[in-house]
Amino acid sequence: MSDENLLTTLDTYLASGIHIGTQQKTEDMRRFIYRVRADGLYVLDVRKTDERLRLAAKFLSNYEPEDIMAVTRRVYSVGPLKKFGQVTGINTVAGRFVPGTLTNPSAKKFAEPEVLFLSDPRVDKQALKEAIEIGIPVVGMCDTEHLTAHIDFIIPTNNKGRKSVSLMYYLIAREYMKNRGLIGEEVPFTYDDFLEKAMNVKVKMNSAPRQRGRFQRRPRR
């Protein structure tokens, strides 16, 4: 496999471990699996991950940043997610997702995004449940063991490692900004900026969305 047409170099992808799955697989994720190693770990197809990353960023770029909510409860994803929100302006929920955030208008942090971006459909199950209830599309990072029936757009990846989640958020942020015409070839942030945040696992978990602007529900496209 060459680097041609990839969002980053193959070496960068492999060094981050985005292709390293788990020892479990589901039928939902079978199409994204390249092989199984001798130790039983399923390996994801890097080219398919790259393709889905590109398409996910293009899909998200149809939405204003204030109309997207990105969430995670995974410790190693908290820092990179906050950096993702900082550079894109997308609203983030890092840590506990308060029940009713999307479904209870009386809730203190009630929000009305048009699309939800998850780091893990199982760990972020409360946010996923509420997105299903209100009928908004869901983009999700999914590993080999995940069920994806309610994920509208799957990004197959190792969503547990510091390096892999940092690379995912960096690439999606970069492509989202490029697709919206906000940056050119000179990118004002780097993968290392995101990775640095992932290395700080003592970041305080914040259950409240970043308030860049009030969510406004728009007619479905």
UniProtKB/Swiss-Prot annotation:
Biological process according to GO: translation
Top-level taxon of the source organism: Archaea
One GO term describing the cellular component: small ribosomal subunit
CDD domains attached to this UniProt entry: RPS2
Annotated InterPro entries: Ribosomal_uS2, Ribosomal_uS2_arc, Ribosomal_uS2_CS, Ribosomal_uS2_euk/arc, Ribosomal_uS2_flav_dom_sf
Alphabetized UniProt keyword annotations: Ribonucleoprotein, Ribosomal protein
Coiled-coil ranges from the UniProt annotation: none
GO molecular function, one term: structural constituent of ribosome
Family of this protein: Belongs to the universal ribosomal protein uS2 family.
Protein name: Small ribosomal subunit protein uS2
